């Protein structure tokens, strides 16, 4: 998704990102 919270529960940057393993990486 873009920003918000990952399925894993950690916070993500407001930019578009993808969750991998247990962390968010900017796409």
UniProtKB/Swiss-Prot annotation:
Protein name: Conotoxin Bt9.2
Disulfide bonds: 2-16, 6-19, 12-24
Claim: Transit peptide is one of the keywords in the record: no
Cellular component GO terms, alphabetical: extracellular region
Localization of this protein: Secreted
Function: Probable neurotoxin that inhibits ion channels.
Principal location listed in the UniProt entry: secreted
Domain remarks: The cysteine framework is IX (C-C-C-C-C-C).
Sequence positions bearing 4-hydroxyproline: 13
Family: Belongs to the conotoxin P superfamily.
């Amino acid at each position: 998704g873009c920003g918000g919270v990952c399925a894993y529960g950690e916070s993500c940057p407001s930019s578009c990102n993808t969750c991998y393993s247990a962390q968010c990486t900017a796409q």
